[in-house]
A protein has these predicted regions:
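Conserved donor-binding/catalytic core segment of Leloir-type glycosyltransferases
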Residues: 209-234, 247
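Aromatic "clamp/platform" in nucleotide-sugar-dependent glycosyltransferases that forms part
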Residues: 298
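Short alpha-helical donor nucleotide-sugar binding micro-motif in glycosyltransferases
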Residues: 276, 284-290
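Conserved acidic donor-binding segment of nucleotide-sugar-dependent glycosyltransferases
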Residues: 330-341, 350-355
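Short hydrophobic beta-strand element within catalytic cores of glycosyltransferases
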Residues: 315-319
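A short helix/loop element that forms part of the nucleotide-sugar donor recognition site in Leloir-type
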Residues: 195-208, 394
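Nucleotide-activated donor-binding/catalytic signature segment of Leloir-type glycosyltransferases, i.e.
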Residues: 256-277
Length: 399
């Protein structure tokens, strides 16, 4: 079976969608599913790497793209270029189309599926309602909610099946009035996420003294990730643990505003911006070095980063919103707290000061993370593809 993935983002752009696509592609291959991926080119000044796919990733077609205003990380595929690339795929060579993002990729991929008479599935990675609130703040929240819900219903009607990465995200779609069948299917963790990171190497490469307890965030440095709240928590944490350092690993549009906030607070020597880290070495080392991993995003459709932290034995303190509620189960190796300054601060301080608690959370977290096998998730996705191919209008629910 051959499945066409179409996405508005992919590596070298680092985010959850890129990670999900790569993880599923790797594991689907062992299920007898060949994937072809159509994504933007990233040939631009200052890009993390060139526009072509890395040598170990065959089956990628890059589309000419242009910059996105006020967003140097992302690229916008050219409509004509995207359709020209899709037109090179011979009719009958694709069994299922899988849309990964809701922008130009969605409309071109849905059109391709209709013209070729093949079923189409989409993964709902992005919680638009909250994103609109952060990126178009002048828009009244009620209007933003109406627009997000109308837009979502319209796009979901274009496909024969939907994938929600978590139960709460499925519930949101049902509340919107989406009638397309919804299947809950998280990405899962590939086996290499459990390769042990080297904490000492991270500290050495980043110039961080061995004696400083690390309060660590990993992810996109964007306003919707609620990192400003974590900075406020850190200010309070230092009153009890003055040697603590906040590590922010990642890039994004909120990096400069956060740097300015840190400067105003006089914390330049206590907050370390690590930037992008190599996924196979630096990122694992970063997790391994964390004395406590903190997270307070309101927009996660899954919260895969929490599982990655647990896989490396990082004790987690986090809020539980949307997709992270599905990850943060009882006994999972995390302290779950409300988004309130004092309770969150108290939980972080408790972990930093209690070595036995750190060890217990680390052990339980590693054990729990292993239950989220990406290979199992890929088999379930392959079953969905097969049911769509056999009977596009009557796919069965995946187990």
């Amino acid at each position: 079976m051959r499945v066409l993935f179409v996405s508005d983002v992919y590596f070298p752009r680092v985010n959850g969608v890129s990670t999900s696509i790569r993880t599923f592609r790797q594991d689907l291959g062992t299920c007898g599913v060949e994937t072809l991926l159509v994504v933007p080119s990233y040939v631009q000044s200052g890009a993390p790497s060139g526009g072509g796919p890395p040598p170990d990733e065959p089956g990628i077609l890059r589309v000419p793209s242009s910059g996105v205003p006020k967003d140097p990380e992302d690229r916008r595929m050219q409509w004509g270029g995207l359709n020209r690339v899709l037109s090179t795929i011979p009719r009958g060579q694709v069994d299922v189309v899988h849309i990964q993002t809701p922008f130009i990729a969605h409309y071109a991929a849905a059109r391709f599926a209709r013209r070729n008479g093949v079923p189409c599935v989409a993964t709902y990675h992005t919680f638009f309602e909250e994103y609109l609130h952060h990126y178009v703040p002048v828009l009244p929240r009620s209007i933003g909610r109406y627009l997000a819900r109308s837009f979502t219903r319209s796009q979901c009607a274009d496909v024969q099946a939907l994938i929600a990465p978590s139960d709460p995200m499925r519930d949101v779609l049902l509340e919107y009035g989406v009638s397309t069948p919804i299947h809950v299917l998280p990405t899962g963790l590939p086996a290499d996420r459990f390769n042990p990171g080297i904490a000492e190497r991270f500290r050495s490469e980043q110039g961080i003294p061995a004696g400083r307890p690390l309060v660590t965030y990993v992810g996109r440095v964007a306003h919707e990730k609620n990192i400003e709240f974590l900075v406020k928590v850190f200010v309070e944490v230092r009153k009890t643990v003055p040697k603590a350092m906040l590590v922010i690993a990642g890039e994004g549009p909120a990096r400069e505003p956060l740097r300015q906030l840190v400067a105003r607070l006089g914390l330049e020597k206590d907050v370390h911006f690590a930037g992008y880290l190599d996924r196979n070495t630096g990122l694992l080392d970063c997790y391994a070095a964390a004395n406590v991993f903190v997270f307070a995003s309101r927009t996660e459709t899954q919260g895969l980063v929490l599982l990655e932290a647990m896989a490396q034995g990082a004790p987690v303190v986090s809020t539980a919103e949307l997709g992270t509620r599905s990850v943060l189960k009882a006994g999972c190796g995390a302290l779950v707290v409300e988004e309130q300054l004092q309770p969150f601060t108290a939980a972080v301080v408790q972990v930093l000061q209690d070595a036995a608690l750190q060890s217990d959370l680390a052990e339980r977290g590693r054990t729990y993370a292993r239950t989220w096998s990406s290979a199992i998730m890929a088999r379930r996705l392959a079953e969905l593809y097969e049911s769509l191919r056999v009977s596009p209008g009557a796919e069965r629910a995946i187990a």
